[in-house]
Regions:
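C-terminal motif of bacterial Sec signal peptides marking the signal peptidase cleavage site
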Residues: 15-18
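An acidic-aromatic pocket/loop used at catalytic or ligand-binding sites
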Residues: 2-6, 20-143
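N-terminal, intrinsically disordered, basic low-complexity segments enriched in Arg/Pro/Ser/Thr
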Residues: 10-11
Length: 143
């Protein structure tokens, strides 16, 4: 009976350890190369972690389109303010903002629109989703 209990405890410990470990290469802290690629276009908070499995970036520099999923530490209001102030400093124009449980910021720059969605997590961090897409063009109506 003691051997069975010991095996159960060891098995539970292994399962807990496996759940707690992060697979290599799944997420990464924003590197200097990534920050440089997006520099001048979209500011990324220091220490932000890119969730690679939820991120898709097409093109580079100031013409990129896609989605960047981040995990950002700090108070939700501070993260909201970081993007609200940082995006215009990078040439984006704020078109709408809403601070709540799930906060939203919308910006335009040239032919692109950026939506930033932020939500606080239960562990004191923030999930941030930045989506950059082509701006909708008005349909020309013919008489």
């Amino acid at each position: 009976m003691t051997t069975t209990k010991l095996l159960l405890v060891l098995f539970a410990a292994l399962v807990a350890a496996a759940c707690a470990s992060t697979p290599i290469g799944s997420d990464s802290t924003v590197t200097e190369a990534t920050a440089k690629q997006l520099s001048g276009d979209v500011p990324l908070p220091p220490g932000a972690v890119i969730k690679q499995q939820d991120t898709l970036v097409m093109s580079a520099a100031s013409t990129w389109l896609g989605r960047i999923s981040l995990s950002v530490s700090g108070e939700p209001q501070a993260v909201f303010t970081y993007f609200k102030d940082g995006m215009p400093a990078s040439g984006w124009t704020l078109t709408s903002s809403s601070f709540s449980k799930t906060s939203l910021l919308t910006f335009t720059k040239g032919e692109r629109v950026a939506n930033i969605q932020m939500q606080g997590t239960s562990f004191g961090g923030n999930d941030v989703l930045i989506t950059v897409a082509p701006a909708a063009r008005p349909v020309n109506s013919r008489p």
